[in-house]
Amino acid sequence: MLMITSFANPRVAQAFVDYMATQGVILTIQQHNQSDIWLADESQAERVRVELARFIENPGDPRYLAASWQSGQTNSGLRYRRFPFLATLRERAGPVTWIVMLACVLVYIAMSLIGDQTVMVWLAWPFDPVLKFEVWRYFTHIFMHFSLMHILFNLLWWWYLGGAVEKRLGSGKLIVITVISALLSGYVQQKFSGPWFGGLSGVVYALMGYVWLRGERDPQSGIYLQRGLIIFALLWIVAGWFDWFGMSMANGAHIAGLIVGLAMAFVDTLNARKRT
């Protein structure tokens, strides 16, 4: 199987698939963050790419609009649900993605009800030498958030990036990225600011770095991040470093997380190339 391209609009993807069916080429659509087009017979790849270039130039051409009828498919296979937003949330996130989101929400509720300090005493990075053997503390800091905007921003990125990694590469890969980046970004951040910090952003930056570089070096992995978004991430690090917006940011965790993600993607793509 070879991934040809992705479309943000599922109906556009279906139009191209239907047209290629009339040309004797069978493509399939897999719905993830976008509608991914896959080709089973890789010997037809060059032909498909030529037709794709023509399609992108003029997707409204009548031959494409009529393709569903010619291929005998009057039903695109799309299903419209009463709550499409909730359906999208479910479809684009695996169990690990959901478990982490739920943990963050529950911890945020607890912090709102009984106070930040009470929760941090149990979940923060070890703040006393006698706590260094409480191993969970090296990871549970990622569940603590200190404002509604803080948790919403992090969970949105976690769902978008973590969900894509889990759906494409499996729950194990997401767990490995999360555990390593939580540990290393937390270690760096406590060197910067001490143990009283929290948030999922170090892991989010690791996912940004991983998804972007993995997509650039290994397009067949099926994950990618637009270059504009990685530029935004870098600008956000700069803004936090120079305190442009007067907000307290975990700059050490952000930088460490990004480096961890890039390093892991580099290693994984090296291994992928050795196998091919």
Curated annotation (Swiss-Prot):
Subcellular location: Cell inner membrane
Pfam families: Rhomboid (PF01694), Rhomboid_N (PF12122)
Active site annotation, chain numbering: S201 (nucleophile), H254
Any one biological process term the GO annotation gives: proteolysis
Function per UniProt: Rhomboid-type serine protease that catalyzes intramembrane proteolysis.
Entry's transmembrane regions: 94-114, 142-162, 169-189, 192-212, 229-249, 250-270
Record GO terms (molecular function): serine-type endopeptidase activity
Species name: Salmonella schwarzengrund (strain CVM19633)
Stated name of the protein: Rhomboid protease GlpG
Membrane topology summary: Multi-pass membrane protein
Top-rank taxon: Bacteria
Keywords: Cell inner membrane, Cell membrane, Hydrolase, Membrane, Protease, Serine protease, Transmembrane, Transmembrane helix
Entry keyword annotation includes Membrane: yes
Recorded family membership: Belongs to the peptidase S54 family.
Broad class of the protein's primary localization: membrane
Reactions catalysed according to its record: Cleaves type-1 transmembrane domains using a catalytic dyad composed of serine and histidine that are contributed by different transmembrane domains
A GO CC annotation given for this chain: plasma membrane
Phylogenetic classification of the source organism: Bacteria, Pseudomonadati, Pseudomonadota, Gammaproteobacteria, Enterobacterales
HAMAP family to which the protein is assigned, alphabetical: Rhomboid_GlpG
UniProt EC number: 3.4.21.105
Gene3D superfamilies named among the record's database cross-references: 3.30.70.2350, Rhomboid-like (1.20.1540.10)
